[in-house]
């Protein structure tokens, strides 16, 4: 099948954005718009957003790497600038290792590089991959509202969205929430998919540490100072495994940094790219 993608627009060299778990790429309008002023921006659409896909049939999260490889081969893309956030950053890195010709540079923003101690602890606990708070939080997430305004009001009260502007939150609501066919609205990226990726990453997340020493592209490595994903142990290990990368910690942001400060994060990427 043809892998779907979003054409954000713009002129210049191709830049591919890989979106995170649970967030469709259209949500990141404010982050992608400045990038499209200097680059032609595309964003692959991950399989949870395709029709007729079943999360319970997913056995390996790296199927997203296979999908990205397929997309690049179908479009004939090479020497692309790869930008990824969270799960999308991990997928971009692994794709770059398997097909170095696809990418000229990488910008990895708070990637899901789970620290070895977390992976080891999960391996020692029965049902850790299903009982983890992130997995349970995803499965218990509210997924039905009367309309988009009700969804916006619900999210506006949530502490996790405190730093999001109203415009950023509306970008999420308008692009991540869709009619359910019965008069209400629901999540476009199903919560079962979100939970499935959390579960598989706890079981299989060590793959990123094995691959990092093989990255050959110039890399911008960004960690949100208030992240709960890329903890200090993982950040230090990344620096040891890829010492040639540019490492930057972004202040006053959490894991959702490109929604909290989209323009500042876009400028950070643009400045690094401009340095050559």
Predicted regions located by residue number:
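Active-site loop/oxyanion-hole signature of alpha/beta-hydrolase fold enzymes
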Residues: 42-83, 122, 267
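Conserved HGGG/HGGXW glycine-rich cap/lid loop of the alpha/beta-hydrolase fold
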Residues: 7-57
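Conserved hydrolase catalytic core segment
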Residues: 78-121
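The conserved beta1-alpha1 loop
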Residues: 16-20, 85, 223
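Conserved loop-alpha-helix segment in the C-terminal half of the alpha/beta-hydrolase fold
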Residues: 209-253
């Amino acid at each position: 099948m043809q892998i779907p993608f979003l054409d954000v627009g713009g002129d210049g060299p191709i830049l591919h954005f890989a979106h995170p778990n649970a967030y469709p790429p259209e949500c990141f309008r404010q982050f992608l718009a400045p990038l499209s002023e200097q680059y032609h921006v595309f964003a692959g659409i991950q399989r949870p957003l395709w029709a007729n896909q079943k999360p319970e049939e997913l056995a390996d999260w790296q199927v997203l790497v296979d999908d990205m490889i397929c997309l690049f081969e179908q479009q004939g893309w090479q020497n692309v600038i790869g930008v990824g956030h969270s799960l999308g950053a991990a997928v971009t890195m692994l794709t770059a290792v398997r097909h170095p010709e696809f990418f000229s540079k990488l910008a990895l923003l708070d990637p899901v590089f789970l620290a070895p101690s977390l992976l080891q602890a999960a391996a020692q606990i029965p049902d850790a991959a299903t009982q983890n708070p992130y997995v349970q939080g995803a499965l218990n997430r509210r997924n039905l509202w009367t309309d988009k305004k009700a969804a916006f009001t619900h999210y506006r009260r949530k502490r996790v969205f405190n730093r999001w502007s109203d415009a950023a939150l509306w970008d999420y609501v308008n692009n991540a929430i869709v009619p359910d066919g019965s008069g209400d609205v629901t999540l476009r990226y199903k919560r079962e998919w979100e939970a499935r990726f959390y579960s598989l990453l706890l079981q299989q997340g060590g793959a990123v540490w094995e691959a990092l020493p093989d990255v050959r592209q110039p890399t911008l490595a960004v960690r949100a100072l208030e992240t709960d994903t890329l903890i200090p142990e993982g950040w230090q290990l990344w620096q040891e495994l890829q010492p040639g990368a540019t490492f930057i910690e972004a202040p006053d942001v959490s894991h959702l940094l490109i929604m909290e400060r989209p323009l500042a994060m876009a400028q950070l990427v643009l400045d690094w790219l401009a340095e050559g």
